[in-house]
Design a protein with these regions (language model features):
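Canonical Radical SAM [4Fe-4S] cluster-binding loop centered on the CxxxCxxC motif
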Residues: 1-24
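Active-site groove signature of glycoside hydrolases
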Residues: 38-48
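N-terminal pre-catalytic segment of deacetylase/amide-hydrolase enzymes
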Residues: 22-23, 27, 33-36
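Conserved AdoMet/S-adenosylmethionine-binding subsite of the radical SAM
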Residues: 29-33, 46-178
Length: 178
C-alpha cells in the first residue's frame, strides 16, 4: 500500500517489526505465554496473515482453549490467496475480524493498496465478498480504512461498512497502534 513503510522503514511507534524469519506456530504460542494477560491477541502484520493460515488456526485454537480472545486483521484477500473460503475454518477460533477496506471503489483501492497485477481489477469486490461471508462465520466483523488517503470518500467507506454490510466501521490513522 502507498502508506506502508514495510520495505523502507519497518517501524511502528518505535517498534521494529521486521523479522529475520517467520516464526513457527510453537514460537508464536510460546511468546504469548498466557493469553488471558491481554485484552486480545491480534494476528496482524506487515503483509497478510492469512498467507500462514495454518499457523493462525493452530495458535488461535490454543489461545481460545486457554480462555483468550482472538482478532484477525486482514486485507480480505484470504479466500483468493488460499483458493477457498477460509472463513468456516476460522469459526470458533476468531472472535473478531477487521478487514482493511481502505477505499470506496475498486479503482481507488488498486491505486492505494497496489495489489499484485493478477489481483487488480477485481480484488476490491472479493474483499467485499469476504466481509459479507465473514458475517456468517465470525461473531464480530469490522471494516477499516487508513484515513487521509487521496481520492477516498471516507463517508462513503463508512456507509459501505454500516449501511451496505451492517458491520462496524473503524477509521484509523497510519502509524497509530491500537
Amino acid at each position: 500500500c502507498v502508506f506502508c513503510t514495510r520495505l523502507t522503514k519497518p517501524v511502528v511507534q518505535g517498534y521494529n517489526l521486521k523479522l529475520d524469519r517467520e516464526p513457527t506456530a510453537k514460537e508464536v504460542w510460546e511468546s504469548i505465554d498466557d493469553p488471558k494477560k491481554y485484552d486480545e491477541v491480534v494476528f496482524c502484520g506487515f503483509g497478510e496473515p492469512t498467507l500462514r493460515l495454518d499457523v493462525i488456526k493452530e495458535v488461535a485454537k490454543k489461545i481460545k482453549d486457554s480462555g483468550g480472545r482472538v482478532r484477525l486483521n486482514t486485507n480480505g484477500h484470504g479466500n483468493v490467496i488460499n483458493k477457498r473460503n477460509i472463513l468456516p475454518e476460522l469459526s470458533g477460533l476468531i472472535d473478531e475480524v477487521s478487514v482493511s477496506l481502505n477505499a470506496d471503489s475498486s479503482e481507488a483501492y488498486d491505486e492505494i493498496c497496489q495489489p499484485l497485477p493478477m489481483f487488480r481489477n477485481g480484488i476490491y469486490e472479493k474483499i467485499k465478498e469476504f466481509i459479507e461471508e465473514a458475517k456468517k462465520h465470525l461473531p464480530e466483523v469490522q471494516a477499516s480504512i487508513v484515513t487521509h488517503q487521496r481520492g477516498v470518500d471516507e463517508t462513503r467507506c463508512k456507509d459501505i461498512a454500516g449501511k451496505d454490510f451492517g458491520v462496524k466501521y473503524r477509521a484509523r490513522r497510519y502509524n497509530i497502534v491500537g
